[in-house]
Amino acid sequence: MLNYVLKRLLGLIPTLLIVAVLVFLFVHLLPGDPARLIAGPEADAQVIALVRQQLGLDQPLHVQFWHYITHVLQGDFGTSMVSRRPVSEEIASRFLPTLWLTITSMIWAVLFGMAIGIAAAVWRNRWPDRVGMTLAVTGISFPAFALGMLLMQIFSVDLGWLPTVGADSWQHYILPSLTLGAAVASVMARFTRSSFVDVLSEDYMRTARAKGVSETWVVLKHGLRNAMIPVVTMMGLQFGFLLGGSIVVEKVFNWPGLGRLLVDSVDMRDYPVIQAEVLLFSLEFILINLVVDVLYAAINPAIRYK
């Protein structure tokens, strides 16, 4: 297992290098001139040229790329074109709000999604199944920004129970986490139901029932563990999606996280911040997939030897 983990970690290097090349080319293909945006609408051509020189944008593209990649390999992601702060500081100040929002969203999404999925599988083709799957389809189909605005209108504007924007207290996490986790809970519910339906028809489940074991214990002990392997895969993918896909929710709730930072950076063509964030999101996905593979071995020890 240790050798497998080390090989996967070494595989990070070429993957991240490819991502670094692609994101560098992508940001330089974006329309708009960062120097003009930073200099302001009133700036003349001389001022814009001076700003472009200060940012290093007057150099040939291959020179810019070499400067960028050599600094990245040294752990230096440059300086933000807008704030003039190191990119690492910009990301560090926004990382924790996004991480806590993601964890909060994932916890309730997994709990509710798995509960709905298990209930739908156990009472298949009956009213719990129909109600649960209707809710799941609705959660997947409803756009996140629309759900966020609806929740704000009801619980913040009309009822005045919860704050609308910011991340100062635990109450600020409720509406954004519900909005962000709704689609994930829906996916988890459908995936858990599908996995459990297959498990419930296995021979060992019928054997456990024949021995007189209660249905609740059969489902929780024998069914849950064997149904968890594909569900864990989906959990890992969805966690990565939440970390990198919270852009819309963070924008709606004015959340001080990485998603909003990325949107603001794209608006201002802040190349160093965009490049660093995309690399960070790629690294997160790779590490999450590695953690999922390790969790397989914890759930089913037989996988360790394959």
From Swiss-Prot:
Residue ranges crossing the lipid bilayer per the database entry: 9-29, 103-123, 135-155, 169-189, 229-249, 279-299
Residues annotated as domain ABC transmembrane type-1: 95-292
Biological source species: Salmonella choleraesuis (strain SC-B67)
Membrane-protein topology: Multi-pass membrane protein
UniProt KW keywords: Cell inner membrane, Cell membrane, Membrane, Transmembrane, Transmembrane helix, Transport
Parts of the chain on the Periplasmic side: 30-102, 156-168, 250-278
Similarity comment text for this entry: Belongs to the binding-protein-dependent transport system permease family.
Role played: Part of the ABC transporter complex GsiABCD involved in glutathione import. Probably responsible for the translocation of the substrate across the membrane.
Quaternary organization: The complex is composed of two ATP-binding proteins (GsiA), two transmembrane proteins (GsiC and GsiD) and a solute-binding protein (GsiB).
Subcellular location(s) per record: Cell inner membrane
Positions on the Cytoplasmic side per record topology: 1-8, 124-134, 190-228, 300-306
PROSITE patterns xrefs: ABC_TM1
Pfam families associated with the record: BPD_transp_1 (PF00528), BPD_transp_1_N (PF19300)
Protein name: Glutathione transport system permease protein GsiC
The keyword NAD appears for this protein: no
Assigned GO CC terms: plasma membrane
